[in-house]
Amino acid sequence: MVQAIVKREKWQTRRVVKPQPKAEKFSAIVRCDDFLLARFWSRRPYPRIDDVRARFIPGDILWVRETWQHTKVLNLHPTDANYGYVYRADGREWEDIEGWKWKPSIFMPKEACRLFLKIKNVRNERLQSISEADARAEGFDSVDSCFALWQKLNGIESLAANPWVWVYDFEVIPKP
């Protein structure tokens, strides 16, 4: 999905609402000082309201972690080297030479980050409510291909559970 962000083919993502509300109906997103709450309600078996806090709000800036590797960039002279980073998502094959190996995204330091995202909009919906337009905004050709990856990442039963998800629209911005 990093490749889709780099190519500007992805500008939306979904994350499971945690914890999942026990109340089944969505009421509203409530803006508090520096956070958002999704309010859910139900009348059976008794009146109930569940408030769930969004992890991000519009204006938040996130940095994208990706598989990366240190590299040595040689200028005019071999002794005049500086160190930089290369990214597996660029599709180039870099050799594992002298200990320069691919490192998992979870170990990426912020200084190595090249992609920063600014949250533009937050909403929530049931997973299976995704539209074809939203699937394209997620970087997919269709809803079916979006669901296929969802099941691969979250398990076969996750699609049938049809959880509430946060929908985050974002834009790529220069390094802040």
Question: What residue spans do the PLM features occupy?
Answer:
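Secondary-structure transition motif
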Residues: 1-176
